C-alpha cells in the first residue's frame, strides 16, 4: 500500500522529489537507510512479491509511472519528500483526509499544532495541478503560420500582377485580399477566444487531477481487495515442532519446498561494472546526506539525485548540479576540508520574450557562455568550501546570513524548514550497538558545535547572480526599443548600487507642437523603475505557536538555530510606476511584476501605458459628462463609455509575427442611435432594433507611442461580445459609413489638432457634430420610409417663436427637418426639433401660405400640437386596458378642442423609465408617429363633418377614458362578436325586435399604432333619426381604416341591425366607382357590406371629406329594405309570440308570411299558397325601391320626371323550391328573376290588383314620412297594414282573378272592377253592381252599389266644415292593418279629411250610374244563410267554434268579421270566404233573371 496519505507517488529510476511534497518524518540517526516495510503486490503473472510502499498500481494493476504527485493542500517543506521515503513513525505528522479537515502536526511531546488548509494560497494549489497539454496547439504557431501565409500571398501577388491585364489586376488584388482577410478573421476569432485560455487550461488540469485521483482510488480499492483475499493465507499455523527440531539441531530445514527457496533465499551478487557500482554507492551516500545530515534551505528543497549528482532547480532563478565527496560526518563533528560540495554545472532559469527575444537569446543564453560559466563555478566552489569552527563563528558575526525570526506564512516563495522535535531520540538511544568509545564520549559534556550550511551560502550567491542576469536582459531590451521602435519617445537611466533600471515614456508628448496645453499634467509621460530588492518575510502561524508553547524548553532554542541556518533571504525584481497623482488614483492596479519566464520590457511598458491611457480616458470621461456644456446635459453615461478592442499588431524588425493586443478608447455616441427604449413597467423588455447610423460613433484614443489624443470615427463594433443583431447592423451601415468616411476624416483630423491644443474645444466640436448627425439620421430614416423631407420652411420670425423661445437665440434649437404628411393633406408637416433632454421633439404643424407686407409669400403656422412620446409609448404598452364605465354620459367634443389623455393614462406614463425621455428617434418610432399623425388628421376631418351636422360623438377605446360606448342601463357584460369589433351587444331575448338594452364589450385584438387611435361612437337616434333608430342598435361605430396607405384609406360606418334570419346571406355591393391611381382602371369608391351572421351593415367610402353625406344617402336607400325585412320577420314569428302569450302550443300556420331573400335593394317574401297544375305553389312578392329620374321622351327634347317609389312585383314559386332555397343560400340572381316572369306572375292572383297595391303603398309611405317627426311609428304601421291587406284580400282575389278573363268571353259572367286596394265591384248587365269592401278591424262589407251605405256619404257641407275641425285621432287609428280604408269608413280620421270630397262624388256617381238590384234584402239574407251553413260544417269538421265565420245581416248589407291571419284556425274561415263570391254572383244573377221580363 502507498505510504503517502495523499495518494500514491509514482517511483522512477531517478527519484524525482517535489518541492511542495509533504515532509517525511525524521529518520533515525543510527539507521538512516533502513528499508521501508514491504507490502505485498501482484505482478501481471498473478504471483505475489514484495513491493516498496511508494509503488502504486494503475487501473490495469500495473505499476504506476505517472510523474504527478497528488499532494494537494500540503504545506511546503524544507526537507524534500523522497520517493523512496521510509514508513512514518508513530510520532510523525498526521495529515487530514480528503474531506478538507484541518491538518494536525504532532510533535515528540504529543502536542498537536494545527495548520488550517484554508490559508494555503490558491496559486500554490494551482501549481500542484498536473499540466494537461494534450490536443492543444500554440497560438504563436498559428499566428506565425498565418503571417507567413499572408506574406507569401503578397509576394505571389507582386510577382504575378505585372503580367496581368489591367482589368484582371483589380480582380486579382480583390480576390487575394479577400482570401487573406478570411484567414485573419479566423485568427481574430481564435485570438479573442484565447483570452479565456487560462481558465480553460485550469479546467483541463483539474479534470486531469480528478481523473488521476479516480484511477488511484480504484487502485487502492483493488489493492485492498487483493490484501483481503491473501490475508487468510497469512494466518499463523500451529507450532511446527518437527521443523523447529530440525532447525535447532542441524541449522537448516531440509523439508523446504523449492518454490520457497527461490523466493526467500537471496540471489547471488551481480557482476556489473565497477563504475556503475561506484555511482550507485555515491547516490546512496548523497541521499543519506541530503536526508539526514545536510542543512538544505527551503528554496533548494526541490532536487533530484541521479548519475551521481544532485540536481537543484529553483524556479525563476537557476538550475545547478552538485556533488559531494561522501555521506558527510556527524552533525556534532567539526567540518573537514575533505568533506565538501562541488559545483559542477549552472543554468539560469530565464526566458526572454517579445520582439527582442531573438537578440536577447543570442547575447544572454540560458546557459551562460563558457568563460562566464567558469567564473561562476569557481565563485560557487568558494561559497561551498567548508568553514572551520572558529572561522565559522567569526564569519557569522561579520557577515551573517539573513535569517527570518519566525516562519513565513504559507503561500509565499520562502520555504519553511521543518521543526526538529525537542524530544527526538539521541544517537545513543537509537543505536544501542555503538562502540564503548562513543558511549563514553556521550557521557562527557561537550561544547556546542556550530553547524556549517554551505548550500545556504551557495543559494544566496546564485540568487544574486541570477537577478543581475535578468537585469542585464531587461536593459538590453530597453536599448533595443530606443534604437528601433520607440525612438526619441523613450529615455533610459541606469544605476549600479543599488542596481536599478528606469525607463521614461512619452518624453516628446508635451514638447510637441500644439501639445503645450494638454489636460493639465495628466497626459504627461511617466516612468517605470526596476530594482533588485529584498522580499519581505512574514512570520508564520506555526512558528509563532511553537515559540509560545516551547519557549521554556532548552530544546526549542536548538530547533530555532537549526531552522535559522536553513532560512535564507529571498530577493527579487520590483517594478515601480511613477506618474501624475491623478493618473495613479484612477489606475485600476499599481501592482506590476516581471516573470522570469517571460522577460519582456516592451510588454511591461505597454501594460503601464495601457493603465495610463485608461486613467487618462476616465479623467476625460468625467470632464465630458459633468461639465455645464449643453453636450454634457445631452449625453448619458452610456453614451460616453470606455471600450476595449482587440487588434493585431504587425511584426517589425525583431519579429515578423502578428501579435494580438488590446486597445482602450473612449467611445462617444453623439446622436445615440443605439439607445435602447425600455420601461420600468415591463419585466422583460425587448431591445429594439438598432438603426444604422449615417455617422458612426466617435472614438477618443491615445497614441501609445507618442501620447497624443486622437479623435476618429468608429469603423465597426469594438466590443468583444457582438450579437447577431449587431452583426447584421454592421452590414446595413456599410454604405453609409463608406460615404461619410472621406469628409469626416478631414473634419476629425482638424478636431484632433484642436483637442491637443485645448481640451475645452472638445465639447464644442462634439456638440456641432451631434446636431449634424441627428439631422442626417432623421433624413436618412425618412428616405428609408419613403417620406419626403425639407430642411427649412419659409416661416416668419413670429412663427418661429411659436416653436419655442430658444429658436430665435440659436439656429441649432430650431426645427431642422420638416416631413410633409401626405399630398392629400396639404399644409400638414411633422417638425423634428433637437432637444437637450428628449433628444428630439416632434410637433404636428399646420401651415398656410400668406403674403408679407412687402408682397413676398411666406408660411404662417396656424396650429401646433406637440406629441408626447412618453405618453404614446405608455398607451401602446397598455393596449386593451379596460376603463371605467361611463354609463349614460355622452359628451360632445367641441370644435377646435384638443384630445386630452385621461388620468389613468397619465399615471401609466409616470411609470415609464426616466431614461426614455432622452432616447433618440428610431425608424420604427418615426413610422409610428407619422402614421399616428395621419390618423389624427383623418379623424379631424371626419369630426369636422360631424360638428357641422351637429352630431355628438364619443372617442371609444385606445388611450381614452372610455373603453366602451354608453349603455342605457348597467348590465352584465357579454362576449362581443369578433366581427363587430366589440361595439354591439347581443339582445337579451334573442329576438330581432327586442329591447334596446345592450351590453357592451371593448375592442380586442388591436395592436401597434391602431391601438393609439380611438374610434368614434355615435348614437343611432342622432344619425338615423327617431323614426329609423329602432332598426339598429343604440350605438354606431365610425372609424378610419388604412390611414397609413393613401390608396386604401377609407371611412367605415358599422351599424348593427335588429334582425336575424337564416335566409340572410353575406352581401357586398359596390355603389360607386372611381379611377385608380394608374388612370387605366377603376376601383371601388363606395361599397356596402352585410354580414349575415352578425347582422352587421358596413358602409365604406374613400371620400374622406364627404363621407357623412355619402353614408346618409346610401343608408336612406338601404333603410327601406331593412324596415320591410324587419316587419316581414315580425309577421312570420307572430304565431310564436301568440303561443308564448297564451302559454299554449299551437300549430304553425300554413298561410304565414316568410322571408325568402334579402338584398340591399330588394326584398322577396311569401304570404300564401295556391294550387297550380295540381301542385302547391308559394305566392311571392318582390319589393324594390326606384329613385326619381328624368326620362327623355321620343321626338321631344323635354324630359319627363319619373317619381320614385316602391315597385311591387308578384310571382310564384313551387314549395319544393322553397326548401331548396333554404339549403342553397347562394342562389344565383337569374333564378330569382325567373320567379317573377310572366308565367309565374300570372299564377299569383294579386297580379290583377298590383297597380292599386303599389299606389296604396306609396301614398301611405309618403304620408308616414311627412308625419315621421310627430309619429315615428307611422312607417312601421304601413308595412304591417300591407302584409295584413295581402292576407285578407287573398281569399277574394283567388275567386276574382279567374273572373277578370272570363268576363271577356262569357256574357253571363259579371265584369270585375277594382276600384282600389280595398274596394271591388261586380257589374251585372252594366246596370247593376255589387260592392265588396274591406273595412276596419278585419271586416268585409257587401252592399248594393246604387245605394249609399252610410249617412256620412251624403252629409251636408256644414257638417263637413265641422268635422274638419275635429282633433286628430290616436296613432292606432292611422294605417293600422286594414285601416288603409278608414278614409272611407271613419269620418273622424286624418285620412278622411283629405279624401272626403272624392268619396262623396263617387257615391253620387254610383247612385246615378247603377240601378238598385231588385229584392236585394232577400238576396243578402239567402247569402247569409248559406254562409252560416258552410261555416257550421267547417267548424264541426275542425271541432272548434273559433273557426266559424261571423256574418251579420244589416238589411242593405252584409258584415263579415274575418279572423286574424296569425290565428291557428284562420284557414277554415278563409275557406268559407272563398264561397262568398260564387254564391253572391249566383244569387244576384238568379234574382235579376226572375225580375227581367
Curated annotation (Swiss-Prot):
Pfam families this protein is in? Med14
Can you tell which superkingdom this protein's organism belongs to? Eukaryota
Say yes or no: keyword Phosphoprotein present.
no
Task: Please give the chief subcellular localization of this protein.
Answer: nucleus
GO biological process annotation, one example: regulation of transcription by RNA polymerase II
For this UniProt entry, the molecular function terms from Gene Ontology, in alphabetical order, are:
transcription coregulator activity
Q: What would be one Gene Ontology cellular-component term for the protein?
A: core mediator complex
Ranges for region Disordered: 1-51, 71-110, 408-427, 674-693, 894-913, 957-997
Entry's PANTHER family? MEDIATOR COMPLEX SUBUNIT (PTHR12809), MEDIATOR OF RNA POLYMERASE II TRANSCRIPTION SUBUNIT 14 (PTHR12809:SF2)
Family, per entry: Belongs to the Mediator complex subunit 14 family.
Subunit details for this protein? Component of the Mediator complex.
What is the protein name given in its UniProt record?
Answer: Mediator of RNA polymerase II transcription subunit 14
Q: What is the lineage of its organism?
A: Eukaryota, Fungi, Dikarya, Basidiomycota, Ustilaginomycotina
Amino acid at each position: 500500500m502507498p505510504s503517502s496519505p495523499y495518494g500514491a507517488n509514482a517511483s522512477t529510476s531517478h527519484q524525482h522529489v517535489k518541492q511542495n511534497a509533504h515532509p517525511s518524518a525524521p529518520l533515525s540517526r543510527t539507521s538512516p537507510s533502513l528499508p521501508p516495510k514491504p507490502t505485498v503486490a501482484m505482478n501481471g503473472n498473478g504471483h505475489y512479491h514484495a513491493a516498496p510502499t511508494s509503488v502504486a498500481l494503475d487501473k490495469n494493476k500495473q505499476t504506476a509511472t505517472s510523474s504527478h504527485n497528488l499532494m494537494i493542500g500540503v504545506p511546503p517543506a524544507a526537507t524534500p519528500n523522497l520517493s523512496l521515503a521510509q514508513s512514518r513513525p508513530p510520532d510523525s505528522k498526521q495529515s487530514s483526509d480528503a474531506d478538507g479537515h484541518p491538518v494536525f502536526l504532532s510533535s515528540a511531546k504529543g502536542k498537536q499544532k494545527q495548520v488550517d488548509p484554508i490559508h494555503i494560497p490558491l496559486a500554490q494549489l494551482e501549481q500542484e495541478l498536473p499540466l494537461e497539454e494534450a490536443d492543444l496547439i500554440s497560438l504563436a504557431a498559428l499566428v506565425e503560420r498565418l503571417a507567413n501565409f499572408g506574406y507569401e500571398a503578397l509576394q505571389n501577388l507582386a510577382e504575378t500582377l505585372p503580367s496581368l491585364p489591367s482589368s484582371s489586376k483589380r480582380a486579382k488584388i480583390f480576390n487575394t485580399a479577400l482570401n487573406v482577410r478570411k484567414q485573419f478573421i479566423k485568427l481574430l476569432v481564435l485570438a479573442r477566444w484565447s483570452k479565456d485560455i487560462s481558465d480553460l487550461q485550469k479546467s483541463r488540469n483539474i479534470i486531469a487531477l480528478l481523473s488521476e485521483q479516480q484511477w488511484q482510488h480504484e487502485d487502492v480499492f483493488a489493492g485492498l481487495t487483493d490484501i483481503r483475499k491473501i490475508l487468510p493465507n497469512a494466518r499463523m499455523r500451529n507450532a511446527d515442532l518437527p521443523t523447529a527440531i530440525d532447525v535447532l539441531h542441524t541449522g537448516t530445514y531440509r523439508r523446504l519446498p523449492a518454490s520457497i527457496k527461490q523466493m526467500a533465499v537471496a540471489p547471488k551478487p551481480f557482476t556489473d561494472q565497477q563504475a556503475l557500482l561506484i555511482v550507485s554507492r555515491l547516490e546512496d551516500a548523497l541521499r543519506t546526506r541530503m536526508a539526514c545530515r545536510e542543512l538544505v534551505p527551503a528554496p533548494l528543497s526541490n532536487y533530484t539525485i541521479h548519475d551521481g549528482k544532485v540536481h537543484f532547480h529553483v524556479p525563476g532563478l537557476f538550475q545547478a548540479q552538485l556533488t559531494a565527496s561522501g555521506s558527510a560526518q556527524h552533525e556534532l563533528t567539526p567540518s573537514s576540508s575533505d568533506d565538501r560540495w562541488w559545483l559542477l554545472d549552472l543554468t539560469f532559469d530565464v526566458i526572454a520574450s517579445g520582439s527582442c527575444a531573438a537578440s536577447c537569446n543570442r547575447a544572454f543564453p540560458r546557459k551562460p557562455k563558457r568563460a562566464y560559466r567558469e567564473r561562476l563555478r569557481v565563485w560557487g566552489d568558494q561559497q561551498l568550501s567548508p568553514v572551520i569552527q572558529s572561522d565559522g563563528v567569526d564569519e557569522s558575526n561579520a557577515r551573517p546570513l539573513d535569517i527570518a525570526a519566525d516562519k513565513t506564512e504559507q503561500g509565499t516563495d520562502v520555504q519553511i524548514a521543518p521543526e526538529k522535535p525537542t524530544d527526538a531520540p539521541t544517537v545513543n538511544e537509537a543505536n544501542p550497538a555503538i562502540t564503548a568509545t562513543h558511549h563514553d564520549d556521550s557521557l562527557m559534556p561537550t561544547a556546542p558545535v556550530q553547524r556549517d550550511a554551505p548550500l545556504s551560502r551557495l543559494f544566496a550567491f546564485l540568487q544574486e547572480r541570477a537577478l543581475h542576469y535578468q537585469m542585464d536582459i531587461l536593459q538590453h531590451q530597453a536599448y533595443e526599443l530606443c534604437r528601433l521602435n520607440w525612438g526619441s519617445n523613450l529615455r533610459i537611466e541606469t544605476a549600479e548600487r543599488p542596481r536599478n533600471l528606469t525607463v521614461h515614456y512619452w518624453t516628446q508628448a508635451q514638447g510637441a507642437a500644439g501639445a503645450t496645453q494638454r489636460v493639465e499634467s495628466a497626459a504627461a509621460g511617466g516612468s517605470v523603475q526596476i530594482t533588485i530588492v529584498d522580499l519581505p518575510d512574514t512570520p508564520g502561524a506555526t512558528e509563532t505557536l511553537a515559540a509560545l508553547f516551547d519557549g521554556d524548553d532548552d530544546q526549542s532554542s536548538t530547533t530555532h538555530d537549526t531552522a535559522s541556518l536553513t532560512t535564507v533571504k529571498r530577493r527579487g525584481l520590483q517594478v515601480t510606476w511613477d506618474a501624475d497623482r491623478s493618473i495613479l488614483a484612477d489606475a485600476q492596479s499599481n501592482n506590476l511584476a516581471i516573470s522570469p519566464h517571460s522577460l519582456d520590457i516592451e510588454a511591461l511598458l505597454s501594460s503601464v501605458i495601457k493603465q495610463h491611457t485608461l486613467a487618462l480616458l476616465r479623467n476625460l470621461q468625467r470632464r465630458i459628462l459633468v461639465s455645464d456644456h449643453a453636450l454634457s446635459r445631452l449625453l448619458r453615461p452610456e453614451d460616453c463609455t470606455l471600450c476595449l478592442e482587440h487588434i493585431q499588431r504587425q511584426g517589425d524588425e525583431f519579429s515578423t509575427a502578428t501579435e494580438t493586443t488590446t486597445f482602450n478608447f473612449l467611445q462617444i455616441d453623439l446622436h445615440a442611435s443605439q439607445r435602447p427604449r425600455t420601461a420600468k413597467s415591463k419585466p422583460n423588455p425587448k431591445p429594439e432594433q438598432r438603426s444604422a447610423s449615417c455617422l458612426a460613433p466617435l472614438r477618443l484614443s491615445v497614441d501609445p507611442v507618442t501620447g497624443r489624443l486622437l479623435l476618429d470615427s468608429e469603423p465597426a463594433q469594438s466590443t468583444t461580445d457582438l450579437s447577431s443583431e449587431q452583426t447584421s447592423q454592421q452590414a446595413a451601415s456599410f454604405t453609409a459609413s463608406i460615404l461619410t468616411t472621406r469628409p469626416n476624416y478631414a473634419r476629425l483630423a482638424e478636431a484632433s489638432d484642436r483637442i491637443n491644443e485645448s481640451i475645452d474645444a472638445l465639447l464644442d466640436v462634439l456638440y456641432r457634430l451631434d446636431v449634424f448627425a441627428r439631422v442626417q439620421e432623421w433624413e436618412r430614416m425618412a428616405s428609408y420610409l419613403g417620406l419626403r423631407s425639407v430642411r427649412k420652411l419659409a416661416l416668419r420670425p413670429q412663427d418661429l417663436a411659436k416653436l419655442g423661445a430658444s429658436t430665435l437665440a440659436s439656429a441649432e434649437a430650431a426645427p431642422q427637418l420638416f416631413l410633409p404628411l401626405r399630398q392629400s393633406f396639404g399644409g400638414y408637416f411633422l417638425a423634428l426639433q433637437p432637444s437637450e433632454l428628449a433628444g428630439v421633439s416632434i410637433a404636428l404643424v399646420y401651415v398656410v401660405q400668406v403674403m408679407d407686407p412687402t408682397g413676398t409669400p411666406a408660411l404662417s403656422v396656424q396650429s401646433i400640437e406637440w406629441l408626447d412620446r412618453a405618453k404614446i409609448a405608455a398607451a401602446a404598452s397598455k393596449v386593451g386596458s379596460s376603463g371605467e364605465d361611463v354609463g349614460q354620459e355622452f359628451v360632445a367634443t367641441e370644435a377646435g378642442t384638443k384630445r386630452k389623455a385621461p388620468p389613468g393614462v397619465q399615471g401609466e406614463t409616470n411609470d415609464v423609465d426616466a431614461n426614455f425621455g432622452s432616447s433618440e428617434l428610431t425608424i420604427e418610432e418615426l413610422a409610428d408617429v407619422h402614421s399616428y399623425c395621419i390618423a389624427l388628421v383623418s379623424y379631424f376631418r371626419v369630426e369636422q363633418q360631424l360638428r357641422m351636422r351637429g352630431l355628438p360623438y364619443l372617442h371609444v377605446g385606445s388611450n381614452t377614458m372610455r373603453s366602451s360606448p354608453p349603455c342605457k342601463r348597467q348590465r352584465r357584460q357579454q362576449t362581443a362578436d369578433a366581427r363587430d369589433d366589440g361595439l354591439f351587444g347581443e339582445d337579451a331575448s334573442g329576438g330581432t325586435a327586442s329591447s334596446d338594452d345592450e351590453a357592451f364589450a371593448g375592442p380586442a385584438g388591436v395592436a401597434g399604432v391602431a391601438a393609439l387611435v380611438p374610434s368614434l361612437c355615435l348614437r343611432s337616434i342622432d344619425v338615423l333619426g327617431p323614426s329609423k333608430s329602432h332598426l339598429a342598435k343604440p350605438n354606431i361605430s365610425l372609424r378610419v381604416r388604412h390611414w397609413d396607405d393613401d390608396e386604401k384609406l377609407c371611412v367605415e360606418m358599422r351599424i348593427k341591425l335588429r334582425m336575424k334570419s337564416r335566409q340572410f346571406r353575406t352581401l357586398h355591393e359596390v355603389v360607386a366607382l372611381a379611377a385608380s391611381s394608374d388612370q387605366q382602371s377603376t376601383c371601388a369608391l363606395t361599397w356596402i357590406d352585410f354580414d349575415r351572421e352578425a347582422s352587421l351593415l358596413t358602409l365604406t367610402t374613400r371620400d374622406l371629406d364627404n363621407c357623412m353625406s355619402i353614408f346618409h344617402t346610401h343608408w336612406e336607400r338601404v333603410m327601406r329594405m331593412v324596415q320591410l325585412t324587419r316587419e316581414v320577420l315580425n309577421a312570420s314569428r307572430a304565431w310564436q309570440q301568440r303561443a308564448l302569450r297564451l302559454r299554449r302550443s299551437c300549430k304553425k300556420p300554413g298561410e304565414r308570411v316568410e322571408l325568402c331573400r334579402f338584398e340591399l335593394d330588394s326584398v322577396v317574401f311569401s304570404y300564401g299558397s295556391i294550387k297550380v297544375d295540381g301542385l302547391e305553389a308559394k305566392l311571392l312578392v318582390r319589393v324594390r325601391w326606384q329613385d326619381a329620374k328624368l326620362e327623355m321622351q321620343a321626338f321631344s327634347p323635354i324630359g319627363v320626371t319619373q317619381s320614385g317609389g316602391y315597385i311591387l312585383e308578384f310571382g310564384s314559386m313551387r314549395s319544393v323550391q322553397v326548401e331548396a332555397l333554404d339549403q342553397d343560400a347562394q342562389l344565383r340572381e337569374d333564378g330569382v328573376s325567373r320567379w317573377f316572369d310572366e308565367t309565374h306572375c300570372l299564377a299569383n292572383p294579386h297580379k290583377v290588383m298590383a297597380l292599386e297595391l303599389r299606389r296604396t303603398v306609396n301614398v301611405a309611405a309618403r304620408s308616414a314620412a311627412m308625419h315621421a317627426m310627430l309619429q315615428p311609428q307611422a312607417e312601421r304601421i304601413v308595412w304591417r297594414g300591407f302584409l295584413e291587406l295581402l292576407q285578407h284580400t287573398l281569399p277574394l282575389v283567388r275567386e276574382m282573378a279567374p273572373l277578370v278573363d272570363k268576363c271577356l268571353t262569357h256574357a253571363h259572367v259579371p265584369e270585375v272592377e277594382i276600384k282600389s286596394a280595398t274596394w271591388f265591384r261586380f257589374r251585372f248587365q252594366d246596370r247593376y253592381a255589387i260592392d265588396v269592401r274591406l273595412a276596419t278591424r278585419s271586416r268585409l262589407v257587401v252592399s248594393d252599389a246604387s245605394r249609399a251605405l252610410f249617412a256620412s256619404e251624403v252629409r251636408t257641407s256644414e257638417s263637413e266644415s265641422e268635422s274638419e275641425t275635429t282633433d286628430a285621432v290616436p296613432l292606432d287609428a292611422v294605417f293600422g292593418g286594414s285601416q288603409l280604408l278608414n278614409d272611407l269608413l271613419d269620418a273622424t280620421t286624418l285620412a278622411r279629411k283629405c279624401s272626403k270630397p272624392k268619396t262623396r262624388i263617387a257615391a253620387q256617381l254610383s247612385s246615378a250610374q247603377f240601378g238598385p238590384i231588385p229584392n236585394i234584402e232577400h238576396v243578402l239574407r239567402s247569402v247569409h244563410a248559406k254562409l252560416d251553413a258552410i261555416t257550421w260544417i267547417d267548424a264541426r269538421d275542425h271541432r272548434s267554434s273559433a273557426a266559424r265565420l261571423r256574418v251579420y245581416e244589416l238589411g242593405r248589407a252584409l258584415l263579415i268579421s274575418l279572423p286574424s291571419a296569425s290565428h291557428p284556425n284562420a284557414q277554415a274561415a278563409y275557406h268559407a270566404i272563398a264561397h262568398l263570391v260564387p254564391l253572391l254572383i249566383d244569387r244576384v244573377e238568379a234574382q235579376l233573371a226572375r225580375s227581367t221580363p
